[in-house]
Amino acid sequence: GIKIKKGKLRGYESCGMLCSGVELGLTEDLYPGAGYNGLLVLPEDAELGADVKELTGLDDWIFDISLTANRPDCQSILGIAREVSAMLEKPLKMPATDYTETDVEKEGFSVRVEAPELCPRYSAHYVYDVKIGESPAWMKRRLALVGMSAISNVVDITNYVLKEIGQPMHAFDCSYLEGNEICVRRAKENEKIVTLDEQEYTMNENNLVICDGVKPVALAGVMGGLNSEIRDTTEAVMFESAKFARDNVRKTARALGKATDASARYEKGVDEYSTVLGMKRALHLMEELGCGKVSRTHFDVNTGNSIDPTPMTVSVSKVNGVLGIEVPEAEILRIMKNLNFAPEINGDELTIQVPAYREDMLPEGENDVERYPDVAEEVIRMYGYDHVTDTFLSAAQVTMGGYNEEQKGELALKNTLCTMGIYEGMHYSFFSPADLDLLKLPADAKERNAIEIINPINQDLSLMRTTLAASMLNAISRNEKQGTLEGRLFEVASIYIPESLPLTSYPDERKVLCVGTFGNNESFFTMKGIANTIAESMDIEFTYEPVQKSFLHPYQAVKVLCEGTEIGYFGKAAYDIQNELSMRTSSYIMELDLKELSRWYGKKRTFQPISKFQEEKRDLAFVMDKNISCGDVENCIREANKYVKEIRLFDVYEGGQIPEGKKSMAFTVTFAPKEEAFDFEKVQKFVEKICKKLQNEFNIELRG
């Protein structure tokens, strides 16, 4: 950020500035001496006016390339160079891999692979008379430019091969390998290892480890062990270059929360060819840098996979058919030759040899013989997409897109909720056993019959959700902890109910609506109002009956019914759950089964003419037993009089003048006349009839 301009230095005019390496943005890895305090000293033979980048050896380019997942072979300098070589039709210069073996042997040493399904190939080579020191400036500079710090010459060589060849490598200090052997096996249950970053991990049989004769010394494909790391005193090393099963490395890295450069390479795929090439390159560098001497003791355990090219025959006409253009045979041969596929054309048949490093092109099974789309992709990306001409369909039937009834109903439901000021939330489709315990569900509850995920993101997300209530309660708790003490949320998502475990068929996947409200102004009747609004928006009617649920208040919970079918529930969260989640306000939960509710999606609305006569309203307060529900009272009122249009509960009261064990509930009852206006006497008779029915049915009295 310093601007260099004309100034005076000790009384003399100066048009430049003497800089340190730090001021130029250089580090010790990029240029020797740049990391020290003081001015950066350049070579004595440097010419005035020369470009500093050239003098410091930094006249280089760094490419930031976004790779697609199907091209793991391009995760290296060599892989990109192959592509550039094919595009520019320039010869590929392979890294030097020659070295000289001495007659020295590591007597009695052996290598075993006990889990060949997880380790198709394992190579090891013994190097002695090792001298640990700094890497040369050119190597440190190149490593720094690709984001890696120099450590020591031996370790730097393994990192250099990783970036250059794309082959993860590791070096063991032989003085710490006990039992004179290396064994590749599955870890034992609860076996432990301390990795190079001094973190201890507990493993299981799903993890692959590299062991000596006594203990694990590396977590295969992820990181080496601290007990065999390269030290300043190291005198002999055993180099490892292997191919590990990508799925196993991915699962191990995620389960242990251990992502490394090596695991990233293995997860995308490393081929057998790179295993051999990487080892040869590392040994060449050891010899070139004078770091050690290469012995004749080496091992290459191969389970039968070959690094020879795999033949493949496809139809030229099918390749052109996929592309929609005619690519000349000469062009196809040229392109495939440049890509190192050794092509031959005989009539309509194109035969190619797929190199081992192009695993994305290899047949995946005996029936995987029609790979012409892959060949077409290789041809067109080199031939040029600009050769593909615009074409129009000769005839096509245009259909209008749109939502089906279920999608329309779900969208309308969401809009209804949003108009009520309820915010939509989204959660993971997973939860944990702790969430089921939070809901205090009994052991035989269907919600506890949850599908376990084989490879969970973490243990808190190890089960497929069987209810949305736990996620909503946790969301309310998180909001309150962040200082939001009131709010309304909803989520529409799927739950998964298996018929039995372990799974023998697809689970019952159901869309569910979950609404959560919290705050000092929220109540049971708020949630009931939300439910009624949903029903009104669909031109249906909900009825409510008391229900007992382990996570809801025993007297403030109801099940929701529509035409006699149970479609959900709502109620106040139980006090012990609110306390467990440290909630500071009351919270309410509702779940509606949208699979059941979808029966009424798209229902045709029926309209009635507006009455010519004025509606009559009466406020009625009743005294009743505490165990009588609001729904029972409302249903009884409707049965007593056919002119009842609407019933609204506006007050519930206990104590004072109300006898013990009783409560008062006050309703606004609206009567809608149809044929004639109602006078006072007629409405009074309606009220008397309602009171009589309530008295007979529930021993309910009109409050004076």
Please identify what each model-predicted range represents.
Residues 1-406:
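RNA/tRNA-interacting regions in translation and RNA-turnover enzymes
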Residues 3-4, 48-52, 110-113, 193-197, ...:
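Glycine-rich, charged/polar anion/phosphate-binding loops
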Residues 312-485, 618, 670-672, 682-704:
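Extended, well-folded interaction surfaces typified by the phenylalanyl-tRNA synthetase beta subunit core
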Residues 338-345, 360, 364, 499-502, ...:
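A carboxyl-terminal module marker
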Residues 99-103, 353, 397-398, 402, ...:
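Beta-rich nucleic-acid/ligand-interaction surfaces
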Residues 10-12, 35, 57-59, 118-121, ...:
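Short flexible coil/turn linkers enriched for glycine and charged/polar residues
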Residues 21-46, 325, 329, 486-488, ...:
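Glycine-rich active-site loop/lid that clamps phosphate-bearing ligands
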Residues 91-101, 150-155, 286-299, 344-347, ...:
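Flexible, glycine/charged-enriched surface loops at secondary-structure junctions
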